[in-house]
UniProtKB/Swiss-Prot annotation:
This protein's encoding gene: DBP2
Protein name stated in the entry: ATP-dependent RNA helicase DBP2
Complex and partners: Associates with polysomes.
Comment block on domains: The Q motif is unique to and characteristic of the DEAD box family of RNA helicases and controls ATP binding and hydrolysis.
CDD domains in the cross-refs: DEADc_DDX5_DDX17, SF2_C_DEAD
Motif (DEAD box): 284-287
Originating species: Mycosarcoma maydis (Corn smut fungus)
Lineage: Eukaryota, Fungi, Dikarya, Basidiomycota, Ustilaginomycotina
Segments for region (Disordered): 1-37, 508-552
GO terms for cellular component: cytoplasm; nucleus; ribonucleoprotein complex
PANTHER family for this protein: ATP-DEPENDENT RNA HELICASE DBP3
Annotated EC: 3.6.4.13
């Protein structure tokens, strides 16, 4: 069997070479338990999947991630016997080291890495780049970078770019807000532009797996920003919304697919797309995907992709579960760590812990909002449950504060509207549940308020990491009650590592049995933001309450 030979036709242009011709009309499919690998269509030949149909009709799904991970998806997908497949070679090494980089001595490189708290593992790791020009990106990418006003690559970008452009498998560990998305998106553009053009029936060339639909949407925005000039098409595939539009996007052909694992398996299992053309694979927020129970789906997906692909894994932490996944599916990978691989907070965030009772929380919250409103800043308020988020939003709106709630029970249309209101500044207060702490990317959030302390310190670190992003500073207030004392010892460790003030009451809780809140996984969901009175989105629940006499 083979994927078929190359036929004529020109590939994409660009400074990394003109690409290759398209794939020829191979006729063999891959048998697996009665279903052919690729849904009955040959690789490069045959008919496309049709029109997909459907529109944005029907209700929008509820749960965060659309409940993808809760079902036995992919039960019909068998592992491909890649030893029996004649794989067509593809290009993945595009890196030409800039003379300025080559001329740097080892001591200069070590000094730069030390200044960025960067550690490296692996053989023959390329030197980092210190400017965008040194990375050797095509002009169409450089022009977009300059439009965004960045002065230099972030720490993770400076090392990940030469690694990824070299075709290496890569593990990158860095805190949230460190520029990881651009770290893998820009090399993806270069990779795709050197591959043969898509043929009818082909699936994506670059596949990016993400834990939540919000993160998938945000990655798609970044990919569209940089890929538009070379006419790269993207699609985002996630649960909680009708499948019809996503099927249509897949069947029209998209070089880049950003997907949550459950919905992607659903699409592949139903023959709506295939992963035969994937040669560039990214697992973003790998630790979070495993936290949310996606490991079985991830393993099924990776078994459907050719083993000589390039694989990049990005994660905020490096627990044993992520290490095991990397060991199973990455080949001779290089690793870059920014900061410690232990759980640590963003040092650009000032952490203020206020010990109080449940009854005192609302009074403290109003006091903090009065301060924040005077600065005209944006704030996210995190709660432990959807009910608390709704109750608190109702209270704030009736008291004159322009708050909006977002969580897993909100329909996708309303969630999108709330996020737009928050980003625009029309709704500067967003009340959210914990899962949103990983899916939200708004760079100008000045404050985070943990109205409820999370059930684990990992969520605490990621929630306060919604502020202090992209080199900015931020402030995080956390209300800590005696009921949270089990998390005191781990919280003290996080505060001490970041050189933050530790309240005396917290130290006492830590001494007297307050340890072991754990870094376990939570299943909470949601996110919210906004301000009433601007229409659209079909507001429900607390978001539909009129704002009282304005206090903002």
């Amino acid at each position: 069997m083979s994927y078929g030979g190359y036929s004529g036709g020109s590939g994409r242009g660009g400074s990394y070479g003109g690409g290759r011709g398209g794939y020829g009309g191979g006729s063999s499919s891959y048998g697996n338990g009665g279903s052919s690998y690729g849904g009955g269509s040959s690789y490069g030949g045959g008919s496309s999947y049709g029109n997909g149909g459907g529109g944005y009709g029907g209700g929008y799904g509820g749960g965060y991630g659309g409940g993808d991970r809760m079902s036995n998806l992919g039960s019909n997908l068998g592992a491909v016997d890649w030893n029996s497949v004649n794989l067509v070679p593809f290009e993945k090494n595009f890196y030409v080291e800039d003379p300025r980089v080559s001329n740097r001595s080892d001591s200069e490189v070590q000094q730069y890495r030390a200044s960025k708290q960067m550690t490296i593992q692996g053989q023959n790791v390329p030197k980092p780049v210190t400017s965008f020009d040194e990375a050797g990106f095509p002009d169409y990418i450089l022009s977009e970078i300059k439009k965004m006003g960045f002065s230099e690559p972030s720490a993770i970008q400076s090392q990940a770019w030469p690694m990824a452009l070299s075709g290496r498998d890569l593990v990158a560990i860095a805190e949230t807000g460190s520029g990881k998305t651009i770290g893998f998106a820009l090399p993806a553009m270069v990779h795709i532009n050197a591959q043969p053009l898509l043929k009818p029936g082909d699936g994506p060339i670059a596949l990016i797996l993400a834990p939540t639909r919000e993160l998938a949407n945000q990655i798609q925005v970044e990919c569209n920003r940089f890929g538009g000039s070379s006419r790269l098409r993207t699609c985002a595939v996630y649960g909680g919304v009708p499948k019809g539009p996503q099927i249509r996007d897949l069947q029209r052909g998209a070089e880049i697919c950003i997907a949550t694992p459950g919905r992607l398996i659903d699409m592949v299992d139903a023959g709506k797309t295939n992963l035969r053309r994937v040669t560039y694979l990214v697992m973003d927020e790998a630790d979070r995907m495993l936290d949310m129970g996606f490991e079985p789906q991830i393993r099924k997906i990776l078994q459907q992709i050719r083993p000589d692909r390039q694989t990049l894994m990005f994660s905020a932490t490096w627990p044993k579960e992520v290490q095991r996944l990397a060991g199973d599916f990455l080949n001779n990978y290089a690793q870059v760590n920014i900061g410690s691989t232990e759980l640590a907070a963003n040092h650009n965030v000032k952490q203020i812990i206020e010990v109080c009772t449940e009854f005192e929380k609302k009074g403290k919250l109003i006091g903090h909002l009065e301060t924040i409103s005077a600065e005209n800043g944006k704030v996210i308020i995190f709660t432990s449950t959807k009910r608390v988020a709704d109750d608190l939003t109702k209270f704030l709106r009736q008291d004159g504060w322009p708050a909006l709630a977002i969580h897993g029970d909100k329909q996708q249309q309303e969630r999108d509207w709330v996020l737009a209101e928050f980003k625009s500044g029309r709704s500067p207060i967003m009340v959210a549940t914990a899962v949103a702490s990983r899916g939200l990317d708004v760079k100008d959030i000045s404050y985070v308020i943990n109205y409820d302390f999370p059930t684990n310190t990992e969520d605490y670190v990621h929630q306060i990491g919604r502020t202090g992003r992209a080199g900015r500073t931020g402030t995080a207030y956390t209300y800590f009650t005696p009921e949270n004392s089990k998390s005191a010892r781990e919280l003290i460790g996080i505060l001490r590592e970041a050189k933050q003030e530790i309240p005396r009451e917290i130290e006492e809780m830590g001494r007297f049995g307050g340890g072991g809140g754990g870094r376990g996984f939570r299943g909470g969901r949601g996110r919210g933001r906004g301000r009433g009175g601007y229409g659209g989105g079909g507001r429900t629940g607390a978001n539909s309450f009129a704002v009282g006499n304005s206090r903002w």
